[in-house]
Amino acid sequence: MSKLGVVLFVFLLLLPLAAPQPVGDQPADQPADRNAEARARFLHPFQYYTLYRYLTRFLHRYPIYYIRY
């Protein structure tokens, strides 16, 4: 192996493996998790429109669901 190959091998493969892995429950990660939960509950206005479109297509395709008992 050439010197450049050894240097690339050390810096690109061995150093990332030896670096300490980040801990998942650090305080910096918690606000991002809360924001992800809030974004999961929020529907964009266009999503309401697509939901309405799918429901109207479904009800036109299967009119038996219009019947109320």
From Swiss-Prot:
It is found in: Secreted. The mature peptide does not contain cysteine residues. This is Conopeptide Y-Pl1. Keywords: Ion channel impairing toxin, Ionotropic glutamate receptor inhibitor, Neurotoxin, Postsynaptic neurotoxin, Potassium channel impairing toxin, Secreted, Signal, Toxin, Voltage-gated potassium channel impairing toxin, Voltage-gated sodium channel impairing toxin. Residues 21-69 form a propeptide. GO terms for cellular component: extracellular region; host cell postsynaptic membrane. Pfam families: Conotoxin (PF02950). Expressed by the venom duct. Belongs to the conotoxin M superfamily. Conopeptide Y family. One of its GO terms (molecular function) is sodium channel regulator activity. The keyword Zinc does not apply. The lineage of its organism: Eukaryota, Metazoa, Spiralia, Lophotrochozoa, Mollusca. InterPro entries: Conotoxin (IPR004214). The keyword Transcription regulation does not apply. Tyrosine-rich conopeptide that targets several channels/receptors that are expressed in Xenopus oocytes. These targets are the voltage-gated potassium channels Kv1.6/KCNA6 (IC(50) is 170 nM) and Kv1.2/KCNA2 (IC(50) is 2.0 uM), Nav1.2/SCN2A (30% of inhibition), and N-methyl-D-aspartate (NMDA) receptor (GRIN1/GRIN2A/GRIN3B and GRIN1/GRIN2B/GRIN3B) (15% of inhibition). In vivo, causes the marine worm N.virens to move very slowly in contrast to control worms, and causes seizures (at 5 nmol) and death (20 nmol) to mice when intracranially injected. Residues 1-20 form the signal peptide.
